[in-house]
Amino acid sequence: MKTYYEQDANVGLLQGKTVAVIGYGSQGHAQAQNLRDSGVEVVVGVRPGKSFEVAKADGFKVMSVSEAVRTAQVVQMLLPDEQQAHVYKAEVEENLREGQMLLFSHGFNIHFGQINPPSYVDVAMVAPKSPGHLVRRVFQEGNGVPALVAVHQDATGTALHVALAYAKGVGCTRAGVIETTFQEETETDLFGEQAVLCGGVTALVKAGFETLTEGGYRPEIAYFECLHELKLIVDLMYEGGLTNMRHSISDTAEFGDYVTGSRIVTDETKKEMKRVLTEIQQGEFAKKWILENQAGRPTYNAMKKAEQNHQLEKVGEELREMMSWIHAPKELVKK
């Protein structure tokens, strides 16, 4: 595994160049501000609206996506996956010129062929492994978050060096930047989200909650046992792995972990995980998601509404009112 650190990258390669950050959401605002603090000239390309005004208030030169691409030597695409292909076709593609670098923080659109850059530009990825607010906060504290780096197309012969310079400007070389490929990053990222981090965990939490409430236990107690305390366990794993978590819990809980976990996540579960991975590898999920967006997201919206109305959500909202230390966001935002 090749990992790059501060001494392996030269942010000076970006001096005299302009970086265009396309999109000013969670990653956009974090990466743009970190780059600026590292002495890099940054412009923000967004359409008129809330993000435009926020970027302007943050002191950036804000312009249309087309103008930003024409202005910059490095173009970082930080729009949501489902918006990138349309914006690329409409405002980016015709404004690209020889020797520019097209950057991404997720490989979805390149790997699944939704964006096909011309052969005369570099195409690379710098993917911080943290949500934007942490990318920014940790940088301001003098540290950095780990990242992945990949080169899809090296037209200039310097793509990796420029990508590492960008990673250093964002602060990621302070922690370490691991070399990967667009394929590996995309497929593992989607699998982790679907089978473990999002799909797997939410299904497990709901199933546990429903099992207890259907067994006659009060919803409030079920919420505490199946969702609220999850953060305590995940924090222990985050800090020191499974061994640290098991060292920190009671022996009763640890024994229950060993004898029961494999009854819940069974061999059949793992077989289904492999089927999910195959669907991702073969592009079936990507096709499904692309078609869903083209159709106006009917399935997505229906499932989202149903999930928001689950009893677990209603109970949780009431219980969190008792917890003054939890600062629930007034407005839900994409991290």
From Swiss-Prot:
Which residues does the UniProt record annotate as the domain KARI N-terminal Rossmann?
1-180
User: Which Gene Ontology terms describe the biological processes this protein takes part in?
Assistant: isoleucine biosynthetic process; L-valine biosynthetic process
Q: Give UniProt keywords alphabetically.
A: Amino-acid biosynthesis, Branched-chain amino acid biosynthesis, Magnesium, Metal-binding, NADP, Oxidoreductase
| Annotated binding of Mg(2+) 2, by residue | D189, E225, E229
Q: How is the cofactor bound?
A: Binds 2 magnesium ions per subunit.
One GO MF annotation is:
ketol-acid reductoisomerase activity
Q: Does the keyword rRNA processing apply?
A: no
Q: Which GO terms describe its cellular component?
A: cytosol
The UniProt record gives the binding positions of substrate as S250
Active site as annotated: H106
Look up the record and name the pathway of this protein.
Amino-acid biosynthesis; L-isoleucine biosynthesis; L-isoleucine from 2-oxobutanoate: step 2/4; Amino-acid biosynthesis; L-valine biosynthesis; L-valine from pyruvate: step 2/4
Please list the residue ranges annotated as the KARI C-terminal knotted domain: 181-326
InterPro entries in the record:
6-PGluconate_DH-like_C_sf, KARI, KARI_C, KARI_N, KARI_prok, NAD(P)-bd_dom_sf
Task: Tell me yes or no: is Cytoplasm among this UniProt entry's keywords.
Answer: no
- Spell out the reaction equation it catalyses: (2R)-2,3-dihydroxy-3-methylbutanoate + NADP(+) = (2S)-2-acetolactate + NADPH + H(+); (2R,3R)-2,3-dihydroxy-3-methylpentanoate + NADP(+) = (S)-2-ethyl-2-hydroxy-3-oxobutanoate + NADPH + H(+)
E.C. designation(s): 1.1.1.86
List residues binding Mg(2+) 1: D189, E193
Cofactors, names only: Mg(2+)
Q: Which domain of life is it from?
A: Bacteria
The residues that cross the membrane are: none
Q: Which residues bind NADP(+)?
A: Y24, G25, S26, Q27, R47, S51, D81, E82, Q83, Q84, G132
Q: Provide the family line.
A: Belongs to the ketol-acid reductoisomerase family.
This chain's function reads:
Involved in the biosynthesis of branched-chain amino acids (BCAA). Catalyzes an alkyl-migration followed by a ketol-acid reduction of (S)-2-acetolactate (S2AL) to yield (R)-2,3-dihydroxy-isovalerate. In the isomerase reaction, S2AL is rearranged via a Mg-dependent methyl migration to produce 3-hydroxy-3-methyl-2-ketobutyrate (HMKB). In the reductase reaction, this 2-ketoacid undergoes a metal-dependent reduction by NADPH to yield (R)-2,3-dihydroxy-isovalerate.
Any idea what this protein is called?
A: Ketol-acid reductoisomerase (NADP(+)) 2
